[in-house]
């Protein structure tokens, strides 16, 4: 793997991480519990250490993960009370976080995404 690709990958992961950390801060200020914010942080830390080549690699570690369409994966956390929805580029090892929030917020997100498409 080339230096440029590593640097670019690192930048994407860090920026994604910053978005998650900002969202965690928002959750902490809202009516969500600190336990839920901790779950987001834990998931993010685990993903930084993973190398996924396909959806089967994800399911080896996250049995309840769902493949919504090619490259789109939904993770359930906190006993399915919340969702992390990502786009995975398996060939280059990138994970783009598209949504973090409650199940109700996720339904609204999907409606908005369909309107835009």
Regions found by a protein language model. Give the residues of each.
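Basic, Lys/Arg-enriched alpha-helical interface segments
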Residues: 1-81, 89-96, 103-117
